[in-house]
């Protein structure tokens, strides 16, 4: 694991280590452990704040004070996986990491993000229930900016920010999960579609 700070998933959270009282840290781990158990038993859709409070043996208010909302809880559960993904993008080998041309990195980013969503899809979809989580949390802004910078690197000057937002929408967790689970589209086909899309966008720039 990279010894650096990463962009946080949750609004207002810190990317570095946070010092907690020992009892607060134990409560946090008990809540997260209970949340993971519930997800294993009944899926992310079955994880409610009421069920979590009951399983962890705490009041519902304690759960809300710790995580803010159900989406905030899902964001916390996703944090470790997101930090690992950020490390691969920012410091890992090319083409996902630095050192490859912009188009190659765009293709690799989309393919890797599709795989990430399919692995952590239930959590990612539940975390995206809040419009703020979907569009404005620091990690989401980071990926929009990453795509924008790669588009600029490839010579796009006709509103690359807006194009980055449009491309990001195709990697929306709920959209990807729907494509795979409802329409039976294979992940490899999604990745190939992303490759063709960004290639057309870049070469048309």
Language-model regions, residue ranges each:
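Basic, helix-initiating cap at the start of DNA-binding domains
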Residues: 1-42, 46-55, 72-75
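Hydrophobic/aromatic-rich alpha-helical bundle segments in the mid-to-C-terminal region
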Residues: 124-129, 133-137, 141-144, 152-197, ...
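Short hydrophobic/aromatic patch on the recognition helix
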Residues: 57-67
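Alpha-helical DNA-contacting segments of helix-turn-helix folds
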Residues: 74-81, 120, 124
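Conserved amphipathic alpha-helical interaction elements at protein-protein interfaces in regulatory
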Residues: 37, 41, 69, 91, ...
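Hydrophobic/aromatic residues within well-ordered alpha-helical segments
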Residues: 70, 77, 81, 85, ...
